[in-house]
């Protein structure tokens, strides 16, 4: 059955990693509803692997854009863009290295994730209800100040598991004047160093568990499925935000958060620490 769990986890991760709906919340639901028999350590390690597959999909989807880094020395727009990405990554790196373990130990509970989904959904609805014209329409013109603020806001997902890194960076960008497509694309870019770095670090630390207990076949299967599904999700989301707002996602987040709370209240799901 492990290969079935690998495929399902890969699908869930691929769909939810870049949509503003919290991959954490959905992986919790998936594991509980399917009764996945893996230990907490195995689940954590496997989620890191399949997250790597999702991150790789961004590099492949935007491979032409990433190749422009070659012109960094003389292309001012590329200098501005990648300086912004670097600056926006710093807050999460500092916070994660300093307090990552403590945050997981104290806050990583299903009820905390559920409320993060609900509150994030409400904020998403409120931001989408503003009558404000966006000022930034290209990621090359975001600038260092806005990038840093988006990076700080992205940390909300780190200190409040379930809020969603994608949601915090996209909503933060929109609140700072980016239009939806630009905020969404910048969130994709920002995920590469933020999530990619975390995935590599955990892969090195947990390599024996990942390849020993999970098995190479399941690792390749889960990461491969995550890559393909995430690639499709990126294309779909970019097309969606060009003509639609995020209010539907806001309602969905609240519904999933309420569902988790109901499952906890009825004893179907334990509210014990996930760390």
Swiss-Prot record:
Membrane-spanning segments: 1-21, 42-62, 80-100, 107-127, 147-167, 184-204, 214-234, 249-269
Topology in the lipid bilayer: Multi-pass membrane protein
The organism's place on the tree of life at top rank: Bacteria
Alphabetical keyword list: Antibiotic resistance, Cell membrane, Cell shape, Cell wall biogenesis/degradation, Hydrolase, Membrane, Peptidoglycan synthesis, Transmembrane, Transmembrane helix
GO biological process terms on file: cell wall organization; peptidoglycan biosynthetic process; regulation of cell shape; response to antibiotic
EC primary class: hydrolase
Catalytic activity: di-trans,octa-cis-undecaprenyl diphosphate + H2O = di-trans,octa-cis-undecaprenyl phosphate + phosphate + H(+)
Any one annotated GO CC term: plasma membrane
Keyword Cell wall biogenesis/degradation: yes
One Pfam family recorded for the sequence: BacA
Gene Ontology MF terms: undecaprenyl-diphosphatase activity
UniProt subcellular location: Cell membrane
S-S bonds: none
Enzyme Commission numbers on file: 3.6.1.27
Protein's UniProt keywords contain GTP-binding: no
PANTHER family referenced in this protein's UniProt entry, alphabetically: UNDECAPRENYL-DIPHOSPHATASE
Family: Belongs to the UppP family.
Other observations noted: Bacitracin is thought to be involved in the inhibition of peptidoglycan synthesis by sequestering undecaprenyl diphosphate, thereby reducing the pool of lipid carrier available.
Function according to Swiss-Prot or TrEMBL: Catalyzes the dephosphorylation of undecaprenyl diphosphate (UPP). Confers resistance to bacitracin.
NCBIfam families in the cross-refs: PRK00281.1-2, PRK00281.1-4, undec_PP_bacA
Name of the protein this chain belongs to: Undecaprenyl-diphosphatase
Species assigned in the record: Deinococcus deserti (strain DSM 17065 / CIP 109153 / LMG 22923 / VCD115)
